[in-house]
């Protein structure tokens, strides 16, 4: 009996270790290239915590990668580095698989798109079922532990049929994959990464879109909310860049796009009020100012005064008829409340 105890103890440890082994990264994802502007992106969803920290990789002007199933996370940075060296997507995939000496390699799933639109995919024979992939002219959709092939097929169809920029096409693909059944285990996390040269916010940032939902009962709803915010900020930045170049038409177009993603942003309505006036549309200008006032009535006057100091908009102050409509009855904006301070 005593001789059996060590063996039983070892067996228990082995069983415990096996139970603690992380499951495969079951997911459905899409990698894609936008030939119109060179954007590259990945969108992914899974019944797996924080899938965005594992699956999506991308570099502007280089390529995008999704690595999943019995995942080798190293495939992501390795693939990007090889693409930077000038290898095609197909050459990179071949090299990754040749150099992967781990025993679980047959369970891998990976998709690569390079900056020229070349696509390479691999779904190993041991990838958790159902596993597979489908390709289009500019995209590859793939997944494992799915309800069936209808998931990547629906994703590709939605991608091709959706109008607009890459972010919208990727999101539509994810939603279609979910509607087709998605991950057979359910929902938990989602992520989207899109890269564009100098497309990110602030300086030296190529991440045009980078949003993650790590743990949420409805990750698609939350991903949509974050995407709207991300794109609203992107177009807001575009508006200010156009303003700095005295491009009022471009600034208004960017502001209108920002407003479509964030309709309750007081600052955007305020800018649209000034821009419409400067471009000769006083009716729309008053409408936008009215929306800005409704959203933040307490400090509308101060906000208007701050923005009207711009040389682009000072002429509005001399337009008495317009000012009376904007600040009835005498056309004089309210003085800032000194008690509230400059940040109110």
Role assignments for model-derived ranges:
Residues 6-16:
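Bacterial N-terminal signal peptides
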Residues 20-185, 192, 214-256, 260-261, ...:
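Alpha/propeptide regions of enzymes that mature by internal proteolysis
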Residues 236-237, 267-271, 301-307:
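Alpha-solenoid helical repeat scaffolds
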Residues 255, 261-262, 296-299, 303:
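Alpha-helical junction/boundary sensor with strong preference for TPR arrays
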Residues 269-276, 288:
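TPR/Sel1-like alpha-solenoid repeat signature
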């Amino acid at each position: 009996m005593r001789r059996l105890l060590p063996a039983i103890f070892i067996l228990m440890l082995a069983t415990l270790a096996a139970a603690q082994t992380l499951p495969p990264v079951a997911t459905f994802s899409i990698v894609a290239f936008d030939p119109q502007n060179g954007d590259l992106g990945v969108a992914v969803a899974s019944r797996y915590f924080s899938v965005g920290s594992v699956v999506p990789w991308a570099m502007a002007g280089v390529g995008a990668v999704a690595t999943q199933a019995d995942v080798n996370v190293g495939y992501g940075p390795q693939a990007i580095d090889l693409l930077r060296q000038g290898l095609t997507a197909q050459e990179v995939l071949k090299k990754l698989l040749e150099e992967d000496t781990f025993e679980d390699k047959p369970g891998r799933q990976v998709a690569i798109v390079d900056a020229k639109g070349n696509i390479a995919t691999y779904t190993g024979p041991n990838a958790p079922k159902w596993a597979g992939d489908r390709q289009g002219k500019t995209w590859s959709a793939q997944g494992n532990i799915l309800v069936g092939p209808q998931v990547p097929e629906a994703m590709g169809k939605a991608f091709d049929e959706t109008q607009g920029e890459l972010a919208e096409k990727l999101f539509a693909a994810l939603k279609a994959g979910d509607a087709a059944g998605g991950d057979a285990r359910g929902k938990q996390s989602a992520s989207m990464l899109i890269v564009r040269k100098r497309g990110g916010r602030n300086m030296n940032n190529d991440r045009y879109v980078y949003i993650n939902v790590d743990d949420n009962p409805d990750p698609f709803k939350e991903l949509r909310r974050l995407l709207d915010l991300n794109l609203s900020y992107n177009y807001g930045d575009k508006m200010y860049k156009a303003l700095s170049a005295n491009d009022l038409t471009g600034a208004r177009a960017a502001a209108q796009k920002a407003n479509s993603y964030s309709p309750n942003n007081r600052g955007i309505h305020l800018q649209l009020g000034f821009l419409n006036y400067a471009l000769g549309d006083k009716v729309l200008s008053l409408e936008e100012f009215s929306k800005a006032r409704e959203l933040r009535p307490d400090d509308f006057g101060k906000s208007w005064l701050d923005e009207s100091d711009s040389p682009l908009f000072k002429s509005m102050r001399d337009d008495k008829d317009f000012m009376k409509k904007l600040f009835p009855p005498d056309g004089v904006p309210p003085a800032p409340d000194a008690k509230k301070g400059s940040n109110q």
